[in-house]
Structure formats: structure tokens, C-alpha cells
Amino acid sequence: MTNFSPREIVSELDRYIIGQKDAKRAVAIALRNRWRRQQLSDELRDEVMPKNILMIGPTGVGKTEISRRLAKLAGAPFVKVEATKFTEVGYVGRDVEQIVRDLVEVGITLVREKKRAEVKAKAHQNAEERVLDALVGTTASPATRDSFRKKLRANELDEKEIEIDIAETGAPGGFEIPGMPGANIGVLNLSEMFGKALGGRTRKVKTTVKDSYELLVNDESDKLLDNEQIQREAMAAAENDGIVFLDEIDKIAARDGGIGAGVSREGVQRDLLPLVEGTTVATKYGPMKTDHILFIASGAFHVSKPSDLLPELQGRLPIRVELRALTKEDFRRILTETEASLIRQYKALLETEGVALDFTEDAIDALAEVAVQLNANVENIGARRLQTVMERVLDDISFNAPDRGGDTLMIDADYVRKHVGDLAANTDLSRYIL
């Protein structure tokens, strides 16, 4: 779990997302509260519940991007799900408890990678011995092994082809029984059982010495790991530090009428209630409590309103944050100030062909202006509009780049307007460029 301060979390998010100070502060405080809770005594820790967040704002202003960046910062099990993918229990589709099972799987992967890093030195040592076995055999004299070991460490044998045995890591056995959610619960994993009895299945792999190390280090790491301990730690991490980002929650808000799809939508909300409030979900690693999982919900709420959500669900999302629509200045900053800005991306892409791009200040102004106009006249899709505009402006250059290696191309305001200005000015035509 990360121990960044709220200020550090916000400044990290500032590198990738322009504006939206309130939303950044809310998620930063929520993330820091996870760490604060871990410092409490056991009896008080159980009483402190996460304050779930509802982010409201038009599309393309940074709601999903905040969640993506938060996932990398959190250092905790994190899943992002679209609320529209789930259906009420009894309908065809995924049920909401799958969210928790996915969270546990993410936890398992996180803990396994952490444990692998801890035993990497020992695993690398064992992998080297196995490479030597493949090169000179197990019966070679110590002198021969030492001579090959020196060559191996000097990278003289990197291209030599060897055959190694790798543990079989096939898909887990078992199957789901209809009507019994929980994936593999109560189903004997026969392949695992027989695998242990017979010492595990292996497969032969032909590879070079250089490429064999990654396979062998992973194989040796897994031998040194205790799977039961990994599962216990992953379950604890998912229960106490897990974060679930529920995107598009406005799409399951039942609108007036309550007929047709609206009924199923309300059913999904009712299924979400116990999950957000705190319940126990059966997973294939054992029961998992959801009391301390942090839920961050987000939606554009173009058609529906937050008040269209079930009152009980609204009550379980106590922190409301509104994200504002983007202005021309925001678009300018998105193009130039973010860590991996669009202009930087396109410059890097075309540099691979030997073409240097140079954007003037008035070109950046023009790009922002066109994006604002299109959003106002056609459909407001926020920062995503910039991708449409950039693609349109650089269409000819991208197409002809292989023939223009070594050129330096200047993009100015006139060039931008020539390629998109006329379309942006005409609402009817601009509809056809997204």
C-alpha cells in the first residue's frame, strides 16, 4: 500500500491530468485514509469504513484517467469495471460478485510479483545451475562446470541453443457449476492433485541460453514460493486495501417509467448495495469480506441525474465531486504540459521515420480553438476531441512520412485551419469527422 501524502498524490496526478482539483483531492484523501487506517489499533480499525466517492462530470474530462493513474499509484489491488457489463442475478450476463473475484485475482498477481522479487537472487542462482546442467550435463566435473560458468557469466554462450524442462502451468482445472457462483468452488482440481502426487508435469522447451534465464528464473521463483501464504496475503490486501472503480454508473440509473431495461438496471443497483455496504463473497480462495473495499463510482449523468440512483446507493456514496467541462486554456495545457502529451507522442512517432515536427504557439492555439468549437457545435466529448483534430491535421504527414525522411515540418495556425478549420466552421459537415 502506498504511503504518499495527499499533496504528493495530487502532484503525481497533475503530471497526467489537467485541472479537476476537487476530484484529485478527494481521491488523494481517500487513498491516504487507507494508509491511516492501517496505523490504528485492531478494534478501531474494524470500525473505520471507507468513504466512497461519486465523481460526476461530462465525458472526456479525466474521470477514467484519474482512476487509471490512481491504480498505478495505489500499490494495492485495484479493478476498474464498467457498470453496464453487469446484469441482475437471474439475467444473462456477469453478476456483480465477479468484481470481488477479479479483485482477489489482481491481489494474487500483485503479491506473487512482490514475492518473486524477494527470492529473485536465489532463483537466479538456481537458474544458472540448470543452464549449466543443460550445457554440460549433471555428471560433468567441477572444473568443467567452473570453466563453463565463467563463459556463461561473460555472455560468451548467449546464442547457444539448449533444451530445458519447464513446469507445466496450464489453465487451472475444474469448472463452474451453473447456479453456483464462485468459480471452481466445490470442484476438485484434479490436474493439481495428480500434479502434486506425480511431482508436477514438465514440458521441454528449446531456446537460447540468453532467453532461457527469464523462463528458468520464473520457474525457480515459483518453486521457492508458498502458494497458500500468497493466497492469504492477497485476500488480506484485497479486503483491506482493495479499490474498485465503477465507471459509467449513470448508465444503470433507472429513468422514469421503470419498464424494459430500466428494471434490470435497478436490479444491478440492488445487487451493488450489499457489495458497497459490506458483505461476504465466495471466491475460490475462500470467503472474502467487502466491508473495507473503497468504491469510486463515476458517470457523466447527461440523461439521468445522480438522484435517479437508488436512495440507498446514493447514501453509500457520501463524497460527491463534480468535474468541470474543459476550456480552451485546458486544451492548450493538455497538448503541451502533460507528461505524455499528444504533441509529444506524435513527434516521437514521426521521428521513427526521420521526420521532425515543429508546432508553433499559434498552431497550438488553433488546435485548442478547433477542439472547443467542435465540442460546442457537435457533441461535447471533452479531451478526446483533441485526438480527432490531431489525426485530421497530421493525416497527410503521417501518410507520406516514409518518403520524407530527414525533413523538418513546421505546423502553424494556417496549416491547422487549412486542414480542419472549414469543417469546424460548418456544423453539418463537422458531424462526419466524429
From Swiss-Prot:
Alphabetical list of Gene3D superfamilies matching this protein: 1.10.8.60, P-loop containing nucleotide triphosphate hydrolases
GO cellular component term of the entry, any: HslUV protease complex
InterPro entries linked: AAA+_ATPase, ATP-dep_Clp_protease_ClpX, ATPase_AAA_core, Clp_ATPase_C, HslU, P-loop_NTPase
Sorted UniProt keywords: ATP-binding, Chaperone, Cytoplasm, Nucleotide-binding
Binding site residues for ATP: I18, G60, V61, G62, K63, T64, E65, D247, E312, R384
GO molecular function, a single term: ATP hydrolysis activity
GO BP, one annotated term: protein unfolding
Protein's cellular compartments: Cytoplasm
Matches recorded under PANTHER family: ATP-DEPENDENT CLP PROTEASE ATP-BINDING SUBUNIT CLPX-LIKE, MITOCHONDRIAL-RELATED, ATP-DEPENDENT PROTEASE ATPASE SUBUNIT HSLU
Function: ATPase subunit of a proteasome-like degradation complex; this subunit has chaperone activity. The binding of ATP and its subsequent hydrolysis by HslU are essential for unfolding of protein substrates subsequently hydrolyzed by HslV. HslU recognizes the N-terminal part of its protein substrates and unfolds these before they are guided to HslV for hydrolysis.
Family listed: Belongs to the ClpX chaperone family. HslU subfamily.
NCBIfam families in the record: hslU, PRK05201.1
Subunit organization: A double ring-shaped homohexamer of HslV is capped on each side by a ring-shaped HslU homohexamer. The assembly of the HslU/HslV complex is dependent on binding of ATP.
Protein name listed in UniProt: ATP-dependent protease ATPase subunit HslU
Organism: Sinorhizobium fredii (strain NBRC 101917 / NGR234)
Gene (name only): hslU
